[in-house]
């Protein structure tokens, strides 16, 4: 297929009824620095982000753009924050799933994964070179791989 053929065939998509196609934002963060324990991210020195980022605020931004739902992606290494997000998502349908934070290779990993995986909104985990972790080093550990 030639580029012009492809472009002419897809040009009408932009003109189609956008409301008939649900738009899901695949990466948002939820956090509330006013919680008693605060948040590990963003830092207090971040004047733009250091304010509650909760579904109501997100809905006000997203709905006028035609966004109908969002997947929350972890922004905390605290295990309890997985449940905090699930509790918020249970109360607001704009959150259609979450990608949590757990550490494969840790003794409690499987217990936590089984617990959170029971909730259909918990879609998986994100693990990378975040929170002082080193994915390259972890990949050489059998317990990390077996989890």
Segments (PLM) and residue ranges:
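Residue-level preference for short coil/turn positions at secondary-structure junctions
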Residues: 19-20, 66, 94, 118
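N-terminal secretory signal peptides and thylakoid transit peptides that target proteins
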Residues: 1-11
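Generic detector of well-ordered alpha-helical packing
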Residues: 26-28, 75, 82
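Glycine-rich, phosphate-binding/catalytic loops in enzymes
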Residues: 40-43, 87-89
């Amino acid at each position: 297929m030639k580029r012009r053929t492809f472009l002419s065939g897809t040009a009408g998509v932009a003109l189609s009824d956008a409301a008939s196609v649900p738009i899901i934002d695949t990466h948002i963060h939820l956090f509330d620095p006013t919680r008693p324990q605060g948040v590990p991210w963003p830092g207090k020195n971040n004047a733009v982000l250091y304010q509650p980022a909760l579904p109501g605020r997100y809905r006000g931004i997203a709905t006028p753009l035609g966004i109908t739902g969002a997947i929350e992606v972890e922004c905390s290494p605290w295990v309890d924050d997985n449940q905090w997000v699930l509790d918020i998502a249970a109360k607001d349908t704009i959150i259609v799933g979450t990608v949590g934070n757990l550490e494969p290779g840790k003794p409690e990993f499987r217990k936590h994964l089984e617990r959170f995986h029971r909730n259909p909104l918990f879609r998986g985990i994100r693990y990378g070179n975040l929170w002082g972790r080193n994915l390259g080093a972890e990949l050489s550990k059998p317990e990390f791989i077996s989890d």
